[in-house]
Amino acid sequence: MKRNWKTLRDVLEAVEEDRIDAAIAAAEEKDRLAESAGEKSHHEDEFFGHMLLAVDAGLVEGFDVVTVPPSEWGYRAGYVRLTMSGHDLLDSLRSEKGFKKALALASSAAVPLTVDLVKEALKQAVGMVRL
C-alpha cells in the first residue's frame, strides 16, 4: 500500500467527527459496488491501512486494527480520538495553501513528503515561520 494523504485526511476526519463505523461501511460499500461491476477495488484495505498508519504515528488513540490473513480487516475500539498531533496534522491537511506548499517544498528538495514537512509548510504558508 502506498501512503495517500487524502485517505489519511479522510481517516482523521472520520475520527474527529466520530463516524468511524460510517466511514468503514462506506469503504466496504464501494468495494461491493466495484466487485458487482466486475472491477477490483481496495477501498476497505486502503482505509484500514491508513488507520493503522495513523495509530502507528500516534495521531489516533483508542483504536486497534486487527488483520486476519489473507486480507480480512477488523478492529477493536474504545474511546477513539485524535491526539494533539492528529489535530495538528488534520489542520495542515485541510489547508489547501499549506498542503500545496508542502508538496512544492518536498518536490524542490527531492525529499519525501512527511508529517513534519506538512506541518512546517502550513506554518510558512500562514507566515508563522520562514523556512
Language-model features, listed with the residues they occupy:
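Short amphipathic alpha-helical interface segments
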Residues: 2-39
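Non-catalytic, well-ordered alpha-helical scaffold segments
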Residues: 5-9, 45-48, 80, 84
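Generic structural signal for hydrophobic core residues of well-folded globular domains
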Residues: 15-19, 54, 58, 90-93, ...
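Short linear capping/connector segments at secondary-structure termini
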Residues: 28-33, 65-71, 104-107
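Basic amphipathic alpha-helical segments that dock to polyanions
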Residues: 46-60
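Accessory beta->alpha helical hairpin/"wing" motif in late/C-terminal subdomains of nucleic-acid enzymes
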Residues: 65-92
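Exposed, interaction-prone assembly regions rather than primary DNA-binding/catalytic cores
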Residues: 91-131
